Amino acid sequence: MKPHLLLIDALNLIRRIYAVDANQKHHSDEQMLKASCARVAHACSKLLSSTKATHAIAVFDGDKSWRYHFYKDYKHSRAPMPQILKDALVQFKAAIEETGIVVFEPINDEADDIIATLANKASHNNISSVIVSTDKGFLPFLNEHIAVYDYFKKHYLDQDSIKQRFGVEQKKLVEFWAFAGDKTNDIPGVKGIGTKSAQLLVNNYSSVEDALNDDALSASLRKKLTENMDMYVISKQLVSLRTDINLGFSLKQLRLN
């Protein structure tokens, strides 16, 4: 059987399931966590079945990654994980492992970079993979071998839905976010450039250099770009997922029994 890799953004799945159960006020904390663990395990089992995976891994975030050191305001406004959930992560990891899925928590890398590295390596070897996450940062990786699945909306993301949502082609998303920024992760983008201007730039120019070389570029946009080029460079690096992480394990070790 040809390998098929399932890549689960673990905290993305867990936090969303937990958020629903946390609203059930008539449950004790213990009951709530038990219910969340069961629902996470059920989700993993369903994903194994629906994707027909032969290999699978659920990746957690390590300690603060290079992005936090590279840009001090990265994710600074994001609400911290509830302590009760943080303390119970060992239970969630055990629940996932019981489904046969390998659990991996790097020392100081984000799950996004680990998953991107795995998907990229698999793709280069003509191995299909499914990334399970609601994180839009994975969308630039969509190709004939890499799919992105939203477990909560029960659908796969595609080129048309991306174009409709962001107003740009999938292959230009990184450039789009470098200009417009990403508020959910406190990535600034270029000061004064919003969604409309970012769409104009990426839909009409192949690069920021191409835009600046066009005499027809508006004086306002030219000024914003030239005065804030440093933030464009920083933002582009922040939104670009790494595919060169040294994993320390091979695809063979992710095979399901």
Curated annotation (Swiss-Prot):
Keyword ATP-binding: no
Residue ranges of the region described as Interaction with DNA: 192-197
Name the record gives this protein: Flap endonuclease Xni
Molecular function (Gene Ontology), one example: DNA binding
UniProt binding sites for Mg(2+): D112
Record's keyword annotation contains Nuclease: yes
Organism in which the protein naturally occurs: Pseudoalteromonas translucida (strain TAC 125)
Higher taxonomy: Bacteria, Pseudomonadati, Pseudomonadota, Gammaproteobacteria, Alteromonadales
A Pfam family this chain is assigned to: 5_3_exonuc_N
HAMAP family with a match to the protein in the record: Xni (MF_01192)
PANTHER family named among the record's database cross-references: 5'-3' EXONUCLEASE FAMILY PROTEIN, FLAP ENDONUCLEASE XNI
Any one biological process term the GO annotation gives: DNA replication, Okazaki fragment processing
Family: Belongs to the Xni family.
Gene of this entry: xni
Task performed by this protein: Has flap endonuclease activity. During DNA replication, flap endonucleases cleave the 5'-overhanging flap structure that is generated by displacement synthesis when DNA polymerase encounters the 5'-end of a downstream Okazaki fragment.
Keyword annotations: DNA-binding, Endonuclease, Hydrolase, Magnesium, Metal-binding, Nuclease, Potassium
Cofactor note: Binds 2 Mg(2+) per subunit. Only one magnesium ion has a direct interaction with the protein, the other interactions are indirect.
